[in-house]
Design a protein with these regions (language model features):
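Bacterial N-terminal signal peptides
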Residues: 2-17
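A domain-start/cap signature at the N-terminus of enzymes
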Residues: 23-144, 426-440, 444, 455-462
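C-terminal catalytic histidine-bearing segment of alpha/beta-hydrolase fold enzymes
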Residues: 27-34, 38-41, 288, 292-384, ...
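Active-site machinery of serine-nucleophile hydrolases
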Residues: 143-145, 149-223
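Short alpha-helix in the alpha/beta-hydrolase fold that links the catalytic acid
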Residues: 160-163, 288-298, 397-401
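Primarily recognizes the serine-hydrolase "nucleophile elbow" in alpha/beta-hydrolase
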Residues: 223-224, 230-276
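Short beta-strand/loop motif that positions the catalytic acidic residue
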Residues: 280-283
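C-terminal beta-sandwich/jelly-roll accessory domains of carbohydrate-active enzymes
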Residues: 344-466
Length: 467
């Protein structure tokens, strides 16, 4: 698949930084001087940009020859500098601090101007949506973004996008001066259920429409604008909060924070996948009990931070804006999390950060206690990865040197069975492909491989031994 097509598809498949965006205290300092990092960053950006132009099917004849020359020159310039720096400083693929700077501009964006909230017309297959882009926006600088999902009005209909924007944030809010705000247009027939009832014939089609209206449109924004992947937020109104929690469970590495303006019970959902996400629950007299109950559940999920914010005005609580912004300032996604839990709520959604389940039992048919779940913990000090899996036959691990030392063999412990993994070679081209596929310049993993979960040994009475 061409790089240009992969960039486009990544925004729909997953909806789609700076040097410190995903570093952890264990990561060594950069090897390169800032000027050398910046030089490689610019050359990689040109390399990717010219490859996309070369892959363009519309480039034929002299246009293709011109694109070929530009691509060859950019590729040679990047690899020449990469080799020079690698010869001097060692393998750059092991230096996370350097990679994050070098890849920060690897996904190209058109130069677009700021705009107050404006409706973007539907363009098949992307539905219509509203978009606000701050005056401070620059295509070369990652910008915080909010997916603002409207709530229901008194007639149980979804509030129109501009009306909802004005009721919650508006152009005058400080947030609008430094944040991209995306408001989907939700059709009257769409129900943002906590969990669809797939026994109904229309459920699959309704789920497809939800994804188109909310997620496909947000992917369009991420393709067109330089959205900071470490600072994406989901802000949901009444009637959409259950769906917001489900969406966060499906895509745990998509949002750094989730704001629920009318929290509700989500008893149908397993919440184990939410580690790493910050939650802000807006509490009123009507929702105080629901806030307390949801917080009690979220507090039991390792890696989740949940805050209740008492409100002082009427729903949807525009007066809470300054406190919400203060909370948002402290939220930032960390990609290289050392512990990952995946507890799927649907069979299709089974990936988080650097772990994805390949083969598993069906969530919908497995008995309680045997539903698929995997817990993966990387210990770089011991150069060990521990995996505890239930209902899972195999999984894929994407690794970098923040998680384990790839210069040496490392130990895998899967359901208490340990073995030594041989040294894995870092691969630049596959790292680049995975980053583009994910549409995320912080997703930097030069190694990927499959782990098969050992089948449990049968007990003596099950094998007939001793009879």
């Amino acid at each position: 698949m061409s790089l240009s097509l992969t960039v486009t598809l990544a925004c729909f498949a997953h909806f789609c930084p700076v040097a410190d965006a995903a570093m952890t205290p264990q990561d060594p300092a950069p090897k390169l001087a800032p000027a050398d990092q910046k030089a490689l960053q610019g050359k990689l950006a040109k390399f990717v940009e010219t490859q996309i132009a070369y892959d363009d099917p519309a480039a034929v004849g002299k246009a293709r020859e011109k694109a070929q020359k530009a691509y060859d020159a950019a590729r040679e310039a990047f690899w020449s500098d990469w080799k020079k720096q690698s010869d001097k400083h060692g393998d750059l693929l092991k230096s996370i601090a350097d990679l994050e700077v070098i890849f920060a501009s690897a996904i190209p964006y058109e130069r677009k101007q700021a705009m107050t909230l404006r409706k973007i017309d539907a363009k098949d297959p992307v539905p219509a949506y509203y978009l606000s882009v701050p005056k401070s926006y620059k295509s070369e600088t990652p910008t915080r973004a909010v997916l603002l999902v409207p709530g229901l009005d008194d007639k149980q209909e979804w509030v129109e996008g501009k009306k909802w924007f004005d009721a919650t944030w508006s152009d005058k809010a400080p947030l609008a001066s430094d944040t991209i705000i995306h408001v989907p247009v939700v059709s009257k027939a769409v129900e943002l259920d906590t969990m669809p009832d797939y026994s109904k014939t229309e459920s699959e089609e309704q789920e497809k429409q939800r994804i188109q209206e909310l997620l496909l449109s947000f992917g369009d924004t991420q393709r067109g604008y330089n959205v900071d992947r470490a600072r994406r937020f989901l802000d949901a109104g009444k009637g959409a909060c259950g769906f917001a929690v489900r969406f966060a469970c499906h895509f745990p590495d998509l949002f750094s924070g989730v704001i629920l303006r009318s929290p509700m019970a989500v008893d149908e959902l397993r919440l184990g996948s939410l580690g790493g996400i910050n939650f802000l629950l807006l509490s009123s007299a009507d929702t105080a009990a629901a806030c307390d109950a949801l917080k009690a559940r979220l507090d039991k999920v390792e890696g989740v931070t949940c805050t209740i914010l008492p409100t002082t005005d009427a729903y949807p609580f525009a007066a809470a804006g300054p406190e919400i912004e203060k909370w948002m300032a402290g939220c930032k996604r960390i990609v290289n999390r050392k512990k990952i839990v995946i507890e799927p709520n649907e069979d299709r959604f089974k990936q988080a950060y650097w772990v994805s389940i390949a083969d598993m039992s069906s969530v919908h048919t497995a008995p309680e206690g045997s539903k698929p779940r995997v817990e993966v913990e990387a210990d770089r000090a011991q150069n060990r990865i521990k995996i505890t899996a239930v209902g899972v036959e195999s999984l894929m691990l994407s690794l970098n040197d923040s998680l384990v030392d790839l210069d040496n063999k490392f130990t895998l412990v899967v359901n208490d069975k340990a073995w030594e993994e041989g040294k894995r070679n870092r691969d630049f081209n596959n790292l680049l492909k995975r980053m583009v596929r994910k549409n995320d310049t912080q997703f930097l993993f030069p190694v990927e491989f499959r782990v098969n979960v050992p089948k449990p040994e049968k007990k003596a009475d099950e094998t007939g031994a001793g009879k």
